[in-house]
């Protein structure tokens, strides 16, 4: 397929769900762009963010490694986390490298582009904005929690999340990618802490909702403690629409395969329930299919099956990588 005719697919999110989908999509003959959240404030990313006043590198690192085409040993090196003791305690080598590159280059995007060359990534990676976001949550009792990593620990229902600074601008290249997209994919990933921080960037959300491209949400397979306890598939989409202020999701991919009980841990993690009636009321087309992977005993989306389902939504179905 010629370069000019490749469809443009934009995937928006963060956390551990997004890289899985990207591993499937990078095999396709498409222009692939990942727009990644910068609200992480925990672990190695949180330490670097606080000490260096830079974007948290963790989600960006994971996305870049998912799109990479290098020896698996290089990936293992970038994912290596130092042991608990010492000054480097808990830090991930890839986070340190990306942070160092941000100091050596004019911008964080320049640093990403340099690392993209080193890792031979297929696609483009763009942080949602050029400054770290503080994610806050208003809980059901009216209390306010400051910080992405603290929100799921409260054991309370979340009424809403909001960001600081409130009027932060998205990266211009992220907005441009959405404008040019033939397909916009949201998720999978933690609803409140990985998905919504991107959609709370007003200008980016406006471009997404105004786009004529198909907008697809990949529903999580499992609920998440402290975020989506007892949520149905329709509940996820309701929350997204409420935060953005309008209905805009056209379709959603929903796994139908039962997760083996022995993989449902801790005990209060559950499989997301289906609510077809409510989904129909939302006007969202639900695509029910076996999207489950349990490789290595972990519950994930099956990357290739998800990629195939997404690419089937494009007018040109001849998208296999040659």
UniProtKB/Swiss-Prot annotation:
* Ranges in coiled-coil conformation: none
Q: PANTHER family annotated for this entry?
A: GLUCONEOGENESIS FACTOR-RELATED, UNCHARACTERIZED PROTEIN YVCK-RELATED
Superkingdom, according to UniProt?
Answer: Bacteria
One Gene Ontology cellular component = cytoplasm
- Tell me, in one coarse class, where this protein mainly resides: cytoplasm
Q: Which GO terms describe its biological process?
A: regulation of cell shape
Record's protein name: Gluconeogenesis factor
Alphabetized, the UniProt keywords read: Cytoplasm
Question: Keyword Cytoplasm: yes or no?
Answer: yes
The entry assigns this protein to a family as follows: Belongs to the gluconeogenesis factor family.
- List where in the cell it is found: Cytoplasm
The UniProt function text for this chain reads:
Required for morphogenesis under gluconeogenic growth conditions.
What molecular function terms (GO) are annotated for this protein? Answer: LPPG:FO 2-phospho-L-lactate transferase activity
Record's HAMAP family? Gluconeogen_factor (MF_00973)
Q: Which organism is it from?
A: Listeria innocua serovar 6a (strain ATCC BAA-680 / CLIP 11262)
Keyword Translocase among UniProt keywords = no
């Amino acid at each position: 397929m010629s370069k000019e005719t490749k469809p443009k697919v934009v995937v928006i999110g963060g956390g551990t769900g997004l890289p899985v989908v990207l591993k499937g999509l990078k095999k396709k003959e498409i222009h692939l762009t990942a727009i990644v959240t910068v609200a992480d404030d925990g672990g190695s990313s949180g330490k670097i963010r606080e000490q260096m006043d830079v974007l948290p590198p963790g989600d960006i690192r994971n996305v870049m490694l998912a799109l990479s085409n290098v020896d698996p040993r290089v990936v293992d090196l970038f994912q290596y986390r130092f042991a608990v003791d010492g000054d480097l305690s808990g830090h991930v080598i890839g986070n340190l490298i990306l942070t160092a590159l941000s100091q050596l280059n004019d911008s964080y995007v320049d640093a990403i582009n340099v690392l993209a060359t080193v890792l031979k990534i297929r696609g483009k990676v763009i942080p949602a904005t050029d400054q770290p976001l503080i994610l806050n949550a208003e809980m059901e009792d009216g209390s306010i929690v400051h910080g992405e990593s603290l929100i799921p620990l409260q054991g309370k229902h979340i009424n809403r999340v909001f960001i600081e600074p409130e009027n932060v601008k998205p990266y211009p290249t992220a907005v441009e990618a959405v404008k040019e997209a033939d397909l916009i994919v949201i998720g999978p990933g933690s609803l409140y802490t990985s998905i919504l921080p991107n959609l709370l960037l007003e200008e980016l959300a406006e471009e997404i909702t105004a786009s004529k491209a198909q907008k697809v949400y990949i529903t999580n397979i499992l609920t998440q403690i402290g975020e989506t306890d007892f949520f149905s598939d329709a509940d996820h989409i309701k929350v997204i629409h409420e935060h953005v202020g309008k209905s805009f999701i056209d379709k959603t991919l929903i796994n139908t395969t039962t997760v083996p009980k022995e993989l449902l841990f801790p005990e209060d993690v559950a499989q997301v329930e289906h609510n077809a009636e409510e989904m129909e009321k939302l006007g969202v087309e639900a695509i029910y299919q076996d999207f489950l992977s349990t490789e290595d005993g972990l519950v994930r989306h099956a990357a290739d099956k998800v990629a195939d389902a997404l690419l089937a939504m494009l007018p040109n179905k001849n998208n296999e990588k040659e």
